[in-house]
Curated annotation (Swiss-Prot):
Transmembrane segments: none annotated. The gene is Nrf1. A motif (Nuclear localization signal) lies at residues 88-116. GO terms for molecular function: DNA-binding transcription factor activity; protein homodimerization activity; RNA polymerase II cis-regulatory region sequence-specific DNA binding. This is Nuclear respiratory factor 1. InterPro entries: NRF1/Ewg (IPR039142), Nrf1_NLS/DNA-bd_dimer (IPR019525).
Length: 503
């Protein structure tokens, strides 16, 4: 009995010794892992403690370009933005500065939301004190936004004034020499960042014009309504009244939008003072970007080329030419075109803000055939017609015709609805083939060429007959400048929503 007790005691001692040894080994491994993590952090090229990181020549490096130089010359806020942009380029990030203030604001909101989610995940998973600090040293109200783990967030807020002071001093060291200002007019800036007049919103223009008038006229108040106070450069077709409200006639409002009229006021003022160079910030950069940007749907596809879709691993869809197997275009979204399309010659370029502003296309000598087999594909037919309508063309003739071959009633309804929405008052829908014969027999309006021309105002009368035959539907469009964004078509300042009718 005694022997058994001694044996059991020895066995327990052995187990305890093994456990202690295992704990020592775990402590050693944990220490090694922590040391490795710290070493990895110290090896980061963006760490301020790293001797290889030097921001003394941040604006003199190859990362600096015309954009950063333009920003740096705009003042403290622009200097801070230029330093941030140059830092990102120095670290080989494939991004560019967004010069459009409206788009830049949307990007800021989206990225801050993404940063907050990433930071929450980091602090929870890693268990470290971490924050995100965003600063724009504008006076008198600097932007100082900080969020993250407590108490580090509170500590940073406590030293807000010190951080801002040190940042302004650091930026002042890198700021370029101030240029002599010989202009009577202020540069166009939004929140301290230069902006082109064509990218200013209506609200920004309404707030800017009174300030511009102070510089131009030298008076503290514009003197609205007094003809003696009206500048000689003020447009004749715009009343000399407070720009916060549009007091023009209805005819003038229909002809020119209020936003465009406000831009004309600013342009006239700067042209009068000989400072047109201040109207267009980053103009050279934007011109180069637009020249190399092409739309994702089609770019100079040969006439009568039949293409089919092919899904790529990255989620995009390629248009493969039938017969040769060559890739003619890559789509960001499979819904942009139906399954099989015969594409006429298209040359399409996008503007910087992602919208389209071109003349209606003329598909000269070509035909775009959309093969639809279900009523639900009518939306695709509408989208494709819209893309064809805004595809860029150098010049177009009056009465240009777009031919669409539709194989479903819903698609015919949808395309005719879009035609009604987009054609001007003098426009017409032209039917040919069996459809024209059927409608012509009913109405007696078929001409010698076998075509039936229907005014847009009579659309509701004949829409039910559009899909009875399988012949193509020709939509004759007069050239008109328009802007299409998503599913809305803007004409003369009024939005027309595209309605899709299904069976």
């Amino acid at each position: 009995m005694e022997e058994h007790g001694v044996t059991q005691t020895e066995h327990m001692a052995t187990i305890e010794a093994h456990a202690v040894a295992q704990q020592v080994q775990q402590v050693h491994v944990a220490t090694y892992t922590e040391h490795s993590m710290l070493s990895a952090d110290e090896d980061s090229p963006s760490s301020p403690e790293d001797t290889s990181y030097d921001d003394s020549d941040i604006l003199n490096s190859t990362a600096a370009d015309e954009v950063t130089a333009h920003l740096a010359a705009a003042g403290p806020v622009g200097m801070a933005a230029a330093a941030a942009v140059a830092t990102g380029k120095k670290r080989k990030r494939p991004h560019v500065f967004e010069s459009n203030p409206s788009i830049r604001k949307r990007q800021q909101t989206r990225l801050l939301r993404k940063l907050r989610a990433t930071l929450d995940e980091y602090t929870t998973r890693v268990g470290q004190q971490a924050i995100v600090l965003c600063i724009s040293p504008s006076k008198p109200n600097p932007v100082f936004k900080v969020f993250g783990a407590a108490p580090l967030e509170n500590v940073v807020r406590k030293y807000k004034s010190m951080i801002l002071e040190d940042l302004e001093s650091a930026l002042a060291e890198h700021a370029p020499a101030p240029q002599e200002v010989n202009s009577e007019l202020p540069p166009l800036t939004i929140d301290g960042i230069p902006v082109s007049v064509d990218k200013m919103t209506q609200a920004q223009l309404r707030a800017f014009i009174p300030e511009m008038l102070k510089y131009s006229t030298g008076r503290g108040k514009p003197g609205w309504g007094k003809e003696s106070c009206k500048p000689i450069w003020w447009p004749e077709d715009i009343p000399w009244a407070n720009v916060r409200s549009d007091v023009r006639t209805e005819e003038q409002k229909q002809r020119v939008s209020w936003t465009q009229a406000l831009r004309t006021i600013v342009k006239n003022c700067y042209k009068q003072h000989g400072r047109e160079d201040l109207l267009y910030a980053f103009e050279d950069q934007q011109t180069q970007t637009q020249a190399t940007t092409t739309h994702s749907i089609a770019h100079l596809v040969p006439s009568q080329t039949v293409v089919q879709t092919f899904s790529n691993p990255d989620g995009t869809v390629s248009l493969i030419q039938v017969g040769t197997g060559a890739t003619v275009a890559t789509l960001a979204d499979a819904s942009e075109l139906p399954t099989t399309v015969t594409v006429a010659q298209v040359n399409y370029s996008a503007v910087a803000d992602g919208e389209v502003e071109q003349n209606w296309a003329t598909l000269q000598g070509g035909e775009m055939t959309i093969q639809t087999t279900q009523a639900s594909e009518a939306t695709q037919a509408v989208a494709s017609l819209a893309e064809a309508a805004v595809a860029a063309s150098q010049e177009m003739q009056q009465g240009a015709t777009v031919t669409m071959a539709l194989n479903s009633e819903a698609a015919a309804h949808a395309v005719a609805t879009l035609a009604e929405a987009t054609l001007q008052g003098g426009g017409q829908i032209v039917l040919s083939g069996e459809t024209a014969a059927a409608v012509g027999a009913l109405t007696g309006v078929q001409d010698a060429n076998g075509l039936v021309q229907i005014p847009v105002s009579m659309y509701q009368t004949v829409v039910t007959s559009l899909a009875q035959g399988n012949g193509p539907v020709q939509v004759a469009m007069a050239p008109v400048t328009t802007r299409i964004s998503d599913s809305a078509v803007t004409m003369d300042g009024q939005a027309v929503e595209v309605v899709t009718l299904e069976q």
